[in-house]
């Protein structure tokens, strides 16, 4: 059998690596039992995720809704979306926390007009698109935008005064409030509307149903401590049309 590649690049941090590795090993073994040549270990992807997601040998990975609807919708198949049981979000959905420093004078969304905005990536649904849509609906316009490269970097830019605000993925924010003491210096000023969460994808449309079943079973079979650490409730199916209907910010 020809080996394929797999990666879980989203939400990775040292504290969660054992849990992600356990999720993969369980998924891998179930896939191999189905005759699918799942790789021994996950591939570490440190840059150019968009190219990785378009590899023809991509067995399984996780992407963001923005690149899916703009670049990947005709190149990959959806496998399923993790449900993290986020407050005020439907299953498999998430939203963005608009954060400011705890000692900042800004106390409402209206106060963000002209604020310097830290963004992990302009192809991010939670870090770029959703915050801008939220601001535009409120009749606001952010000031200068600074690209940070990661949600945790955006939060640090706000904490250190390099930016006034940032949109942080709710799952990432949950992890930060769990593992990073310094975020106590930040507060949530508001939230964006929920949108479909970060989906698992594959290059092989024919394998998508089997991948979804195996991944869902692997989640259910994870050791409780590790699944709890990820705050992972299960896998849900969200139609591609729901991803494609999410609004982009006006130019």
Identify the role of each PLM range:
Residues 80-82, 88, 94-95, 181-216, ...:
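Periplasmic-binding protein-like
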Residues 59-73, 159, 164-184:
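A ligand-binding cleft/hinge motif common to bilobed small-molecule-binding domains
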Residues 1-69:
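Extracytoplasmic small-molecule ligand-binding "clamshell" domains
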Residues 6-26, 30, 90-154, 225-247:
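Bilobed "Venus flytrap"/periplasmic-binding protein-like clamshell domains
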Residues 158, 162, 207-210, 223, ...:
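Hydrophobic/basic alpha-helical segments enriched in Actinobacteria
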Residues 38-52, 64, 83-86, 144-156:
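Short helix-initiation/N-cap motifs at beta->coil->alpha
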Residues 77, 141-144, 185-187:
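Conserved beta-strand segments of alpha/beta enzyme cores
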Residues 51-111:
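Acidic, polar ligand-binding/catalytic clefts
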